[in-house]
């Protein structure tokens, strides 16, 4: 089969069996093109979170191939991992902000982790905060912000190293419907600026509102892939 893939995401017959014997993925194949916006949906336990972990390098496939921006996740060298991580920004449901650091410092930390210079920090941080509508919150602490604002900071942090791909894992799971719509609209805007966006969610109403490509998982397999609505 295909040995390399330069697209943002390629899964080729990806399987994942955890140490306890759970077969989380049973041969999953799909690709995501540059600049695409994709919803990854399915019931609890369908394999969505395993796919996220494969894309971020948290786990490696038991069989098959997972390629992220040209990096093969099953045989990536330790020293390549920081470079791979630069190409992909991750947004979590629970925000994962550092509580005793300001918004600016949360972003600065993510930039320093990949070796950005002070000048890059100075240019990039105001830009991403402006992009997510939080230009005036640079010196605020997470607990001074609403849930929706904290998720915007998490999105800014995912964007701060200018990744080509953003993966959002249930990004609206802790938000009310109004805020959820705002966050999805923001992700759509980021996608319109050229970033590939993959959103894992189970919120059917939101998915159907946006009319994007939907990859539907069930029991560790892809059972649907295309434009349309999320009906199970």
Segments from the language model and where they lie:
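Catalytic Walker B motif of ABC-type/P-loop ATPase nucleotide-binding domains
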Residues: 166-169
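A short, proline-enriched helix->beta-strand linker immediately N-terminal to the Walker B motif
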Residues: 160-164
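ABC ATPase NBD coupling module
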Residues: 19, 73-89, 118, 190-192
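Short coil-to-helix segment of the ABC ATPase nucleotide-binding domain corresponding to the Q-loop/switch region
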Residues: 101-109
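Conserved ABC ATPase signature
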Residues: 141-145, 149-151
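Conserved ABC transporter NBD signature motif
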Residues: 64-72
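Helix-to-loop junction immediately C-terminal to a conserved catalytic motif
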Residues: 56
